[in-house]
Amino acid sequence: MKKELMKKIFDDTAYVRTGGSDAEKRAAEYLRQTASDLGLEAHLEPFEVELATVEEAVLTVDGREIPCKGYLLAGSGEVEAPLYYLTESDRYSLSGCKGKIVLFDGYLGYWRYRELLENGAVGFISYDGNVNYADRDIDHRELRPHVAKGEKLLGVNINAKDAVDIVNSEAKTAKIVLKQREYKGNSHNVIIDLPGETPEQIIFTAHYDSTSLSQGAYDNMSGCVGIMAMAEYFAKNPHRYSLRFIFCGSEERGLLGSKAYCIQHEAELKDVALVINLDMIGCIMGKFISCVTAETALVNYISYLGSELGFQVKAYQDVYSSDSTPFADKGVPAVSFARAAGRDLAPIHNSYDTVAVMKMEQMQKDVDFITAFASRMANAAICPVAKEMPDNMKEKLDEYLLRKKKKA
C-alpha cells in the first residue's frame, strides 16, 4: 500500500470511536468503503454489546467537588462513606475496605473488583493520567459485565492530580452520585474474504475501536491499515490458503469483537490454521515484537525469518492482550505483531495517541515483514504450525481469561 493512502486512512479516522458508539459504526462503514475502493468486498457483522449513557456523575470529598467521570454500567444511586486509600492486597490492607469508598491505584480488573466486593467496600474511585502532564483529562471507564457479574458498586474515575491532592490532604469522607441509562446496542466486525485453493483459512485480525480519549492512531488504526494493506497485496498475489481479514469492534472493551466472532463462527474454527493479529505497529520508535500463542517452533521460525530478511524482531511465547487470544483459547495457533514503543514514546489510551507518533515509512517496513511471513504460511503445502495449544499456553490463557488467578 502506498504511504499516501496509509496516511489518508489515519487522517480520515482521527476521532474517538468507542465500542458500540455511532462513531465506531462510522469507522466500520469507512473501512468497508476503503476496501471497496481497493476492489475488495467487505461486509459488516453485528454483535450485541452492553451500553450506557451517564446523565450525572458527582464526586464530593470532604465537601469539595472533584471533577470525575462515572463508571459506565456501574448502576445508579448515591453513597456517602469514609474514604480509604488501598495500596496492597494483603488481608490487613483489604480489611480496611469495609463500609468505605475505596480509592485505589491501577485498573479495575476482575480480581481487584472481587476484593472490593468481598471485603465490604461500598463504592470506589480510580484515577488515570500523569501528574507531570499539563492536561487534566479523565478517561471514561466502565464496569465490565464479566467483572461485575451482576454485583454493582458505584464508582468514578478522576485525574491523577486530584488523586494526589486527596491523599495528600488526608481526606476523610467521600460521596458519589451516579445516574445513568443502561441499554443494549450493536458493535460490528468488518470482514473481507479472499478464497484460496483450499477452504482452510488463515485469519488476520486488527481492532478499529478506541478508548474514550483517544483517536487510536497507534492503538489500533495502525493494525487496521496493516491488514488492509495485506488484503490489497493478497488480492493480487497467490495464496493457497483462503484468507479472512477481520477488523474487530469493541476490543478495548474486553476483546468483544473477537469473542463474538469465535462464538458466531465456532464450527468454522476447525478449518483455521493460524491467526495473525496486528495491534500497534508503525510508530516512529520502538522494538518490533512477535508474541506467539502456539508452539515454540513458531517463535524460532519468526526469529530466523527476521535474520533472513534483515529485519529486527523479538519473538517470544506468551498470551497477547488483543484479538488473537479468543482464537487461541479455542485451540487455534495465533501470533500477534506489534512495534512496542512504551508510554514515553507513544502513549496509548489517552489524547496523545494521534498520527503524530506514526511514520508511514515504518508502517510500510513493518507491513512488508508481516506480509513476507504471512505469504510463506498462506502458500505452504500445509501450514507448518501445529494445531495444538501447548500446556503452558493453556495455563496462561486460563489466567488471562480469569478462569484462574495468576500466582503472585
Model segments located where?
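N-terminal capping segment at the start of a domain
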Residues: 1-23, 38, 132-145, 209, ...
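Noncatalytic luminal/extracellular "stalk/propeptide" segments of secretory-pathway proteins
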Residues: 8-98
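Second-shell loop/turn segments in exported
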Residues: 14-22, 41, 102-106, 151-153, ...
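Alpha-helical metal-binding/catalytic segments enriched in His/Glu/Asp
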Residues: 35-36, 106-107, 117, 126, ...
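Soluble metallo-hydrolase cores and metallopeptidase-like ectodomains found primarily
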Residues: 62-67, 71-85, 89-91, 139-217, ...
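Structural recognition of the beta-strand scaffold that forms the well-ordered cores
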Residues: 102-103, 123-126, 157, 191, ...
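Metal-dependent peptidase/peptidase-like ectodomains
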Residues: 199, 248-346
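His/Asp/Glu-rich mid-to-C-terminal helical/loop segments that flank catalytic regions of hydrolases
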Residues: 232, 344-408
